[in-house]
Amino acid sequence: MRFHSLILAVLVLLGTQGFAQIPLLSPSPPLARRSVSPNPSAVQRPSVSKETEAERKARFQELTAVLKDRIAEASDKVMSKIIDQEKDLRMRLSYFEKQDRLDPNTFATKEEIQNWQKLVDQFQASRDKTAKVYGDASENLEAALLEEKIAPALATAIRKEIISTFPWDDIVKKNDLLTTYVGYHRQLLSLFDQNWQTWNSAKPYFADQKTEADYEKLCQQITSAGKEIDTLYKKDNF
């Protein structure tokens, strides 16, 4: 998901909805800002009778430039958390997508199975943390916009506009798929643990028909869920 390209569109949209008639920035500027800052003469609104059309346009353009910079600052604070957490989740997902994870012969000891069960728990925790950063995104974005001294009414409007661009249906679907995917791997590891060293070196791994059927079903479910998750990642560029 890329949001910097949306900032100008947001500004244009807000400008067409009457926000040009309300303050864009809060009265008191932040103590420390990036290099872009409005000239005092541009921020202070001259009387309408004395302000020429060119001056009004220049003032609005300068305020818009400052606002664009501050929206970028605020959105970066929120998006960096989401991006970092998505990276952690993708890394953990990649471990479990390897075909070796479906082969019982890759486990030399029962302790290795237990270690992977711990990794499954960490995978689930990463999924849960990712869901939380998305869930907190709206509140965190508005707080970040207010910290950038954007006027409250405008901050709320910008927050709503940006948050509406999130692919929420796919985010929820991905969260559900990941929980299901983790559950399948948990079941597979339990199957290996319960049938320790009863498998063959090549397929079919299990002589017991029910165990083999359970194994094959889990492998198919893991593969299918994994493909759906990858499709969503490619579609939405998480």
PLM regions with names:
Residues M1-S5:
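Positively charged n-region of N-terminal signal peptides that target proteins for export
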Residues I22-E112:
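Leu/Val/Ala/Ile-rich N-terminal alpha-helices, chiefly Sec-type signal peptides and the beginnings
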Residues T198-F238:
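A cross-kingdom marker for long, charged
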Residues L102-A202:
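Extended amphipathic alpha-helical interaction segments
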Residues G18-A20:
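Boundary at the C-terminal end of the N-terminal hydrophobic targeting segment
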Residues I71, S75, M79-I82, E86, ...:
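A structural signal for well-ordered alpha-helices, especially hydrophobic packing surfaces
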Residues E55, E62, V66, P104, ...:
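Primarily heptad-repeat coiled-coil rod domains in cytosolic scaffolding/tethering proteins
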Residues I7-G15:
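Bacterial N-terminal signal peptides
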